[in-house]
């Protein structure tokens, strides 16, 4: 947690492969792509996150004396290799899609160009960092979409799978759209709003509910949200909250950020009845917050039922992405450049499952926007040296079905390259935005999606296609591999 050197945050086989390369030197430079194949939670997109922590990992990548001593104790690694590790630094290039960007399956989120030993070592940590935060940012985006503009508070720390998942999950949740977090350490580390009310234990520690409410309101008159379901929401909690609000008003205390929170029961019914009671007392502007094992589906249902809730505390199902607890990012070799060569040789991984056949070569990703609407038409994976003129018509190819291709008419679209340089020759060339800036950027990104692609259930797919050049390279490699298999 908050570690600066995570060099041993790797799988053992990365190190054993490194030693193999060291003992059998080829001096190859390679390209690895980090991408995913299936959108989380049945959606049509993901939100990429974790780049800042990935950069910190790369910048602090080095083996301490105690790391070398530990590796020596495993009786696997030879002394000359351990000596090499003692001076190891990352010297390659990394390109990445910025955090908060809407992304789709099979397009590279991160591209690593480096000597093969360096590129191999960083695989595990890159996947660990990007997979986790992208998952939670995506879940948060879905939850926020379901809330239809209401504020979402991230409340999941106590249910997260450990401190790091709580800290960085909360960071990712804010990038995905949450207004803030209950996690104070995340607030301190990333300068994001920290939010919270009080627990049932606060109410229970006082002789009665009214006294508990009154004491809390006196202490926090400018941020007074009272938890009303400790005993009985409508017979006790809301009446006592109204009594306290009335007394504060009579005392000349201006109520600004105030309201109630309901943490159990029929949230639709209780919120409607509570609103009637608050409105009758002149507090129709009070916030009604809800918690209680919420997720995007329940929030969407409550909004459809016209529940009088305008603030939501979401914990377990957000911080764990409970219905889809893993982001399936992978890290695959795409090209190799031998010592003395000036060009990369494309590499392809085959599979009986066409979805798992990789896209070869040194690639980049362009987003194609409709010029008239600003919405995404498709994403295009192409070779890194390709140049396109938006005034010219372009043919793009479905990566799985060779019979499907799309014509994009010149003059009707705009292009944006998504992969940006982050590390060059081991040196940082990228400035990470603040988390709240990423949150605003992420909102704008999601607005480039068609409404049909933002549906929580059965959304319209956004297509990721290949350029003619990449399509031809992939087709030729597949044919070569098929011929070799027949020999």
Describe these PLM feature segments.
Residues 201-381:
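Glycine-rich phosphate/ribose-binding loops and adjacent secondary-structure elements
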Residues 1-222, 249-250, 256, 332-487:
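Ordered alpha/beta subdomains of enzyme catalytic regions
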């Amino acid at each position: 947690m908050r570690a600066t050197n995570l060099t041993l945050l790797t799988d053992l086989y990365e190190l054993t492969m490194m030693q193999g390369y060291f003992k059998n030197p080829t001096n190859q430079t390679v390209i690895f792509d980090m991408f995913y194949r299936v959108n989380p939670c049945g959606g049509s997109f993901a939100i990429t996150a974790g780049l800042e922590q990935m950069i910190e990992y790369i910048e602090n990548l080095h083996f301490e004396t105690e790391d070398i001593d530990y590796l020596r104790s495993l009786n696997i690694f030879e002394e000359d290799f351990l000596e090499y590790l003692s001076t190891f630094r990352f010297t390659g290039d990394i390109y990445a899609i910025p955090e908060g960007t809407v992304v789709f399956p099979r397009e590279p989120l991160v591209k690593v160009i480096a000597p093969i030993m360096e590129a191999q070592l960083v695989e595990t940590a890159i996947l660990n960092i990007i997979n986790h935060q992208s998952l939670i940012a995506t879940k948060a985006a879905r939850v926020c979409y379901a809330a239809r503009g209401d504020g979402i508070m991230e409340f999941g720390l106590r249910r997260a799978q450990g401190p790091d998942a709580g800290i960085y999950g909360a960071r990712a949740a804010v990038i995905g759209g949450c207004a803030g977090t209950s996690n104070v350490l995340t607030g301190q580390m990333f300068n994001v709003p920290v939010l919270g009310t009080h627990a049932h234990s606060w109410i229970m520690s006082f002789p009665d509910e009214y006294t508990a409410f009154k004491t809390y309101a006196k202490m926090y008159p400018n941020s007074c949200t009272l938890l009303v379901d400790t005993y009985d929401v409508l017979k006790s909690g809301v009446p006592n909250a109204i009594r306290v609000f009335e007394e504060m008003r009579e005392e000349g205390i201006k109520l600004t950020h105030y309201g109630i929170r309901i943490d159990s029961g029929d949230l639709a019914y209780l919120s409607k009845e509570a609103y009637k009671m608050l409105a009758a007392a002149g507090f129709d502007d009070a916030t009604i917050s809800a918690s209680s094992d919420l997720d995007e589906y329940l929030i969407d249902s409550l909004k459809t039922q016209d529940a009088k809730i305008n603030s939501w505390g979401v914990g377990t199902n957000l911080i764990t992405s409970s219905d889809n607890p893993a982001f399936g990012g992978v890290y695959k070799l795409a090209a190799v450049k031998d010592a003395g060569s000036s060009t990369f040789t494309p590499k392809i991984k085959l599979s009986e499952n066409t979805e798992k056949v990789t896209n070869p070569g040194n690639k980049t990703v362009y987003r194609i926007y409709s010029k008239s609407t600003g919405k995404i038409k498709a994403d295009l994976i192409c070779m890194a040296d390709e140049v396109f003129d938006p005034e010219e018509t372009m043919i793009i190819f479905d990566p799985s079905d060779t019979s499907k291709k799309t014509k994009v008419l010149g003059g009707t679209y705009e292009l944006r390259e998504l992969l940006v340089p982050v590390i060059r020759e081991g040196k940082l060339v990228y400035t990470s935005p603040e988390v709240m800036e990423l949150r605003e950027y992420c909102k704008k990104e999601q607005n480039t999606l068609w409404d049909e692609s933002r549906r929580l259930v059965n959304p319209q797919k956004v297509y990721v296609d290949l350029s003619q050049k990449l399509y031809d390279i992939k087709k030729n490699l597949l044919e070569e591999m098929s011929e070799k298999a027949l020999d």
